Amino acid sequence: GLGREFATQAEEILGIRPNVPLACVVAILEDTHSEPLRHPEDRVERMGGTSRWGVRDGALYGVVTLQGVDEAWLTDVLRPAVAGRVGVALARHGMAGAAAAFRLAARAAATLPAGEQRLVWASARLPELLLETSPEVGAMIEEQVLGPVMALPDRQRTTLLETLRALLRHGGSATSAAGELFCHRNTVMYRSRQLVELTGCDLQEPRGRLMLELAIIAHDLAVASGRGVA
C-alpha cells in the first residue's frame, strides 16, 4: 500500500535500521493550498531528530525515527507547527508496522472536525477509531442513548449536551462541572437527573458512564462528518 511504499523509500533514504521505532504522521490537506503542518522536517532536524516527508493523495506523510526520543518529544516538536488535522501512530517495531501505523494515523486525523488545528495520537483516539470504523454501531449507540435528548428543542438539547460533556470531563462531579459551566451546582444536579431520565444511563454507574461516553463521541463524529446535527 501507499504507506508501506513511502516507508520503504524513507528507510532507503534515511538509512533506518529495520527495527528502530518510528512515528508515522499523516496531516490532511483540506485543499490544494493548505499547509496542515508547517516545515516539520526542519523542526525535527533542529531538535536533533531524523525524518522524511512527502505529499501523496491529499495528505502530507511523514516518518520520524524515535531512536533515543519518545512520543512526548515528538508531540512537543510538532505541536507549534500544526495548522490542520494531524494524526500520529507508533510503528513500535519499525518499518514492518509502518503501513498499519499510517492507516491508523490517517484515521485518527479524520476523526477531528474539518478545520480543527490539532495533533492527535491514534492511541489517544481509540474509542473514536472504533466507532468511525463502524458508523452504523455509532449511530445505534447515539440513537439508543441520546435519542430522547436529540428530540428536545434546540436550546434545551444544547444545554444538556454541554452539561453532559462537562460532567464526563470531570468524572461525574457536579461541583467541578458547575465551575466550568459558570452555574450553580444544584443546576447541574438537576440537569444530571434529567439526563438519567432521558437516557436511562447514570454517570455514577460504570456501564452507564461508558454508554454516555460512547454516545457523545458517536454524536460528535457524526456532526464532524456531516451525518448529524449539533
List each model region and its residues:
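Cytosolic nucleotide-utilizing catalytic cores of signal-transduction proteins
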Residues: 1-230
